[in-house]
């Protein structure tokens, strides 16, 4: 399975977000990871 950093839904292998707008507790960090995943 995917390993995601606690407090985020996008930082790590894959993501655990239900949709693109869901970020988790650490929103600024997750936003950066989400943008990077889209590269």
Swiss-Prot record:
Localisation per UniProt entry = Secreted; Nematocyst
Cofactor requirements of the protein: Ca(2+)
Disulphide bond pairs:
11-33
The record's account of tissue expression is: Expressed uniformly in tentacles (at protein level).
Binding positions (Ca(2+)): 10, 12, 14, 37
Q: Where is the active site?
A: 36
Query: What reaction does this catalyse?
Result: a 1,2-diacyl-sn-glycero-3-phosphocholine + H2O = a 1-acyl-sn-glycero-3-phosphocholine + a fatty acid + H(+)
Q: How is its activity regulated?
A: Inhibited by morin and p-BPB.
Designated name of the protein: Phospholipase A2
